[in-house]
Amino acid sequence: MTTVPKLTDALLTLENRVATLTLNRHDLRNALTGSNLIDDIVTTAEWVNQCEDVSVLVITGAGSAFSAGGNIRDMTNRSGDFAGDVAECADRYRKGIQRIPLALQNVEVPIIAAVNGPAIGAGFDLANMADIRIASDNAKFGETFLNLGIIPGDGGAWFMQRLIGYQRAFELTLTGRVIDATEAKELGIVLEV
């Protein structure tokens, strides 16, 4: 029997060769910062590559959101991952959230993002790191970094242009426009709604 790692802020299950990672900080709308979700995602990616019983990894969110991305309260208060000067924040970013795309790109099985609600900012980028995205009718997608006066630094700009082309990715990044699941399917961001 395969031992599934115990995670802090996410749930990991394995059934019929399908590993399901559920981001479980619905009180924070599954924000990646201000929680242990970054470590949980990286731990899961490493475990999947060592487990012969996994054929696919599904990532989803608990509650009403897939992931709100960064913790806006911490950003506003310049606390948590966003405390300190620019150099300190940049260092925490590299040692924190930027570990996610590095870990997921090395996963040797297909990754499916089951987007159950809003995927905003780094949450949208997390969905874009998957090989396939399936969205519920409640899903919304937004590359909203510019609305906060920041740029996507967790791989989102690179992943999105691979999915939908440079021009459309540039438009979504520069406008911060939030799109619904239907438009996301029309653009080729999601496979099915």
Region locations from a protein language model:
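Generic recognition of short, well-ordered alpha-helical segments
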Residues: 32-36, 70, 125, 155
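Crotonase-fold acyl-CoA enzyme core
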Residues: 102-193
